[in-house]
Amino acid sequence: MNHFPKLLSSQIGFDVAQTMLEYFDRHYRIFREAAVDAKTLFERGDWHGLQRLARERITSYDERVKECVEVLEDEYDAENIDDEVWQQIKLHYIGLLTSHRQPECAETFFNSVCCKILHRSYFSNDFIFVRPAISTEYLENDEPAAKPTYRAYYPGTDGLAVTLERIVTNFQLDPPFEDLTRDIGCVMQAIDDEFGHFDEAPNFQIHVLSSLFFRNKSAYIVGRIINADRVLPFAVPIRHVRPGVLALDTVLLRRDLLQIIFSFSHSYFLVDMGVPSAYVDFLCTIMPGKPKAEIYTSVGLQKQGKNLFYRDLLHHLSHSSDRFIIAPGIKGLVMLVFTLPSFPYVFKIIKDHFPPPKETTRAQIMEKYQLVKRHDRLGRMADTLEYSSVALPLARLDHALVRELEKEVPSLLEYEDDKLVIKHLYIERRMTPLNLYLQNGSDADVEHGVKEYGNAVKELMKANIFPGDMLYKNFGVTRHGRVVFYDYDEIEYLTDCNVRRVPPPRNEEDELSGEPWYTVGPHDIFPETYGPFLLGDPRVRSVFMKHHADFFDPALWQASKDKLMQGELPDFYPYDATLRFSVRYPARFGATGENDGAGDAQRAA
């Protein structure tokens, strides 16, 4: 600190720090209560309740920040506190965190509050936590009644089958299992299929995180197998095979499969973590290479993930020299998109003006992005990080990009010394645009991309999402080969749409007309008209009609809408249906496998 206070003499400084921590503690208490409630809702099979709980939790953080800011302004006139006291506030806050179980998240909460009160000129480590102050290494809750972060099991003592059964039953889920012995047998067979026979080393053990991970209609057991110097990750999803009866659905034993269920295109898990940094450290051991920012986000601590991401960006900028450039591909009508080639993300800014035929506003587009944030993304919609007042070094901006920014978003720019401050932007994982993937790919790539595209749109419609603009350029291909939607300015709930067939032409003039001969309402959709936009490439057309000929039939869309209107929530699985035990080992299930919906499994990883 440039001017470290020699004496922490300000009572206001201590009171403000304590107030901020009290509001963070309130936030985290609500966060944990949501995870506890998720277990109850899962046991009851209350899927609508789980959806509602997940949506409410997303907004809870901002509500606590807003409440805290209002108290600080009303009781302490926070905007007029002088610089020396603000420095003391931070130091008092650090002192209050020395034995805290969530210090990194509390520091982020401090930043969130300060950013609402202080001018951005104060956004330095003197006043906020640009860098962390409290270490989270080896942090555990050592209170006698507290759950450990993970439990260790030793199969060498009682055998693997008994150990696996104990792992499952220790979670004390209320509904009974249909046939836990059968399911444990499937787990053991899957382990043997994946790894074959392996010699048990003296340190052979299984570590299992103490809390279940809830999302959609599944509860996941997450852990790792330790044997000699090998660390083998696993996740076991538990599902209701029918109301009030549970089963282990599969076991995921490959790192890439775990990375998909923890990916940026899925909604956040609800998981009860007394010490979140310990959970994240554990998850890093089974998904090495996955940024901590993404893991914090996936377990529901998206503000901490956002904070870590920004630190990662600043660190990368200080250790790289390439320039931000306009993103390659077809330019959008609504968003200006740029990227830093050495950094695997894109930066998206809403333009000041939209040319015809776009009829929307900045506020409406921002609401669409919030809709996606709150909605179940099912592995088919990219998560976004939203930032305000992002300062980028001018020397790192390509001249063509600066000209484009000044042309398209002048209202969002401020020049500040050697930096360009962008008042508002979104950041997303960079993907290969699907149109380029199909254009440049082999025949096998085209088949994969088209099949994935159709699956993605069909899964989105079953989740009550109509993408609006379904051109290939609005979808991307992830590094795992998944097709993900990422252009949200025309997104709508399918239940708000009016699915229509194209009326037959009234005469030859109608038939030859390039314009519709029928009225089109603002929420009307005509699936039969999508073909000319999607099937122009002969390779694409052939594969599309092979896998998704029903895509252009309004009946498909209307059937999904009807089920949604009746309150149905379809089953989705963030792994291939062929991995499900009932599909993979049908002989173990006999007649019981007929009722578990295996034939209708949707792949939504």
Curated annotation (Swiss-Prot):
- E.C. number: 2.7.11.5, 3.1.3.-
- InterPro entries given in the database record: AceK_kinase (IPR046855), AceK_regulatory (IPR046854), Isocitrate_DH_AceK (IPR010452)
Q: Which positions are annotated as binding ATP?
A: 327-333, 348
Keyword annotations: ATP-binding, Cytoplasm, Glyoxylate bypass, Hydrolase, Kinase, Nucleotide-binding, Protein phosphatase, Serine/threonine-protein kinase, Transferase, Tricarboxylic acid cycle
Q: Which reaction does it catalyse?
A: L-seryl-[isocitrate dehydrogenase] + ATP = O-phospho-L-seryl-[isocitrate dehydrogenase] + ADP + H(+)
GO biological processes: glucose metabolic process; glyoxylate cycle; tricarboxylic acid cycle
Give this protein's Gene Ontology molecular function annotations. [isocitrate dehydrogenase (NADP+)] kinase activity; AMP binding; ATP binding; phosphoprotein phosphatase activity; protein serine/threonine kinase activity
| GO CC annotation | cytoplasm
Subcellular location per UniProt equals: Cytoplasm
Q: What does the record give as the active site?
A: 383
**Family per similarity comment:** Belongs to the AceK family.
Q: What does this protein do?
A: Bifunctional enzyme which can phosphorylate or dephosphorylate isocitrate dehydrogenase (IDH) on a specific serine residue. This is a regulatory mechanism which enables bacteria to bypass the Krebs cycle via the glyoxylate shunt in response to the source of carbon. When bacteria are grown on glucose, IDH is fully active and unphosphorylated, but when grown on acetate or ethanol, the activity of IDH declines drastically concomitant with its phosphorylation.
Protein name per the record:
Isocitrate dehydrogenase kinase/phosphatase
Q: Source species, please? A: Burkholderia cenocepacia (strain HI2424)
Traced from the root, the source organism's taxonomic lineage reads:
Bacteria, Pseudomonadati, Pseudomonadota, Betaproteobacteria, Burkholderiales
Identify the coding gene. Answer: aceK
